[in-house]
């Protein structure tokens, strides 16, 4: 299948998942959506997740009538892998498709923030695919029940970013143009290190504060020189950068672990490859996405590997933020990735 046709199929599948999840959000009580269904793959699975997973398997089973692929996603068992068509020989698989059917479950199930459907596609490699293999990425907003506009963004490698906005009231779509911030300072802008959950927030906040002080100095009494927005969705964080709302973001939770524990660890809830599978979209928009040491972001396409990442709205600002982040990490005795 030509990549353009595959893109159209993915856009259709995303729309079906989005509409099914929104319908369930309209019909289900908050407490029911937030019921824990299982703990598998790389994260906690809630009742609302099961809705998207059922649609995911159904729709991708239909896609298997046209192409062969390895699907990587939560909800597919402990290894998070299923080959389509069922029983296909690995030698005949064309693509690896990694999906997060609801990125931002916690915010969505309590109707606090939109969630995102994330998909990355790579030509299949028998030895295993990595993030850098992804050549097509799609992200679709799952809106709150009270929200009538929702966005979809996509990118093909070296083809730039494309986006459209859907009006749920009348079904129309309009083209929109993502525009990351071109600011060269973090002063009076949004940006932060992710610290969503109890257990490590003190260290993460200390690194964040140290970095901010390095870049802006001590804030005068009664003033805030920069701001933060802890959006519990990696796709949502990328969206905030893409739309110019945030200037920089980082998720460095794996760096709190000793280096020997940073591979296939299960002791801390971290970002996973399916969470960052659309980073191609950010890079195609000119956003710098990398590791804390400045090297290109990469990870195996699985459901377990912890991922540490930094994203900065433009290269000029990245040249200021990355050295400050590295200095802040060193000050707090946190080792960079190898």
Segments from the language model and where they lie:
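N-terminal subdomain of lithium-sensitive/metallo-dependent phosphomonoesterases centered on the IMPase/IPPase/PAP
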Residues: 1-102, 315-317, 322-326, 330-338
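A short glycine/serine-rich beta->alpha loop
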Residues: 40-45, 103-107, 226-228, 267-269
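An extended, acidic
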Residues: 10, 14-17, 21-24, 140-338
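DPxDG-like acidic metal-binding loop motif
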Residues: 90-158
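A generic structural motif
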Residues: 2, 103-105, 197-199
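Short, conserved micro-motifs enriched in small and acidic residues
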Residues: 7, 43-51, 109-112, 232-235, ...
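Short secondary-structure capping/junction motifs at helix and strand boundaries
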Residues: 65-72, 126-135, 162-163
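Conserved long hydrophobic alpha-helices within structured protein cores
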Residues: 50-55, 62-74, 117, 235-253
């Amino acid at each position: 299948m030509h990549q353009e046709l595959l893109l159209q199929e993915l856009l259709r599948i995303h729309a079906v998942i989005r509409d099914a999840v929104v319908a369930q959000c309209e019909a289900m009580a908050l407490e029911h959506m937030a019921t824990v269904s299982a703990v598998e793959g790389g994260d906690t699975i809630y009742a609302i997740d099961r809705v998207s997973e059922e649609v995911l398997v159904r729709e991708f089973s239909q896609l298997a009538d046209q192409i062969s692929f390895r699907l990587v996603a939560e909800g597919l068992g402990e290894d998070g892998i299923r080959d389509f068509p069922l029983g296909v020989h690995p030698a005949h698989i064309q693509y690896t498709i990694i999906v997060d059917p609801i990125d931002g479950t916690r915010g969505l199930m309590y109707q606090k923030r939109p969630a995102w459907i994330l998909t990355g596609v790579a030509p299949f490699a028998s030895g295993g695919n990595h993030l850098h293999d992804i050549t097509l990425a799609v992200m679709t907003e799952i809106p709150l029940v009270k929200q009538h506009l929702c966005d979809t963004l996509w990118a093909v490698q070296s083809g730039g970013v494309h986006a459209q906005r859907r009006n749920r009231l009348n079904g129309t779509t309009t083209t929109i143009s993502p525009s990351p911030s071109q600011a060269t300072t973090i002063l009076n802008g949004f940006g932060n290190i992710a610290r969503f959950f109890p257990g490590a927030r003190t260290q993460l906040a200390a690194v964040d504060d140290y970095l901010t002080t390095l870049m802006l100095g001590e804030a005068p009494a009664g003033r805030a020189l920069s701001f933060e927005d802890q959006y519990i969705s990696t796709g949502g964080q990328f969206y905030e950068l893409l739309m110019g709302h945030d200037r920089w973001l980082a998720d460095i939770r794996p760096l709190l672990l000793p280096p020997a524990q940073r591979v296939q660890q299960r002791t801390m809830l971290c970002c996973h490859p399916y969470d960052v599978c659309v980073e191609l979209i950010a890079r195609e928009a000119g956003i710098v996405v990398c590791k804390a040491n400045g090297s290109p972001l990469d990870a195996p396409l699985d459901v377990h590997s912890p991922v540490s990442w930094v994203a900065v709205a433009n290269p000029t600002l990245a040249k200021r933020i990355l050295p400050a982040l590295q200095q802040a990490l060193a000050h707090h005795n946190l080792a960079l990735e190898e």
